[in-house]
Amino acid sequence: MNHTLPALSKRYSDNPTFILESPELSLSGEGYTCIIGINGSGKSTFGETLAEISANNPGEKWYYLPQHLDRFLFAENLSEQLSALLSQEINQPRLISLIEELGFSDPQGMLHFPFLLMSGGERRRMALVCVFYLEPVRLILDEPEIGVTAKENMVLLSKLHNLTGKNTRVIIISHNAAFVRQSSDIICLINGKIARTGQTKDLLSDPTFELEKYGVRFSQ
């Protein structure tokens, strides 16, 4: 299923030397897309800008889960968060199943457990529970592996493949080699510009393509 990303442009008044410039991009893979680049290359700006320009177009809206969860977890707990986002009643059995899948030993108790009392990794997983419950048609995850164990990352990868199998378009911003290698497309950023893009299988088979150049880590 081909998908086209619009051209993007972004600059900041407090950092005039950085400009994000991305042409219209065609993504041809069936799975998720990975955006890679060293710190400061514009990955988060790419995700934020795509979400911003699509916000007023319901047919093309991208749902964005940022690195910094204070911008996402606005309620006191998961139950209140989802109640504020949804117009229909929460499917508790489905939600509890998702909480358990993401590694929580007391899924029932976590429904009303305050976000502020959770560790960083727990808050990250709880935000992912929220996203997976909502099942948006287009989803951007900004470094979802932060604070998450290797075992939990495997669960996350499985959930992502399930989402893309339901025709959800997913973009992941990541330094994690496992996430990059299992993607269908890769977008490489250097200083706010597209350095390379293409299907993952083609890029990884190219001897001139080096993941390390874009800050991808193989130790996770």
Model features per residue range: what roles?
Residues 173-175:
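H-loop/switch region of ABC-family ATPase nucleotide-binding domains
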Residues 1-5, 9-23:
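A short, flexible loop at the N-terminus of ABC-type nucleotide-binding domains that lies
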Residues 193-217:
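Conserved beta-strand-loop-alpha-helix hinge in the C-terminal portion
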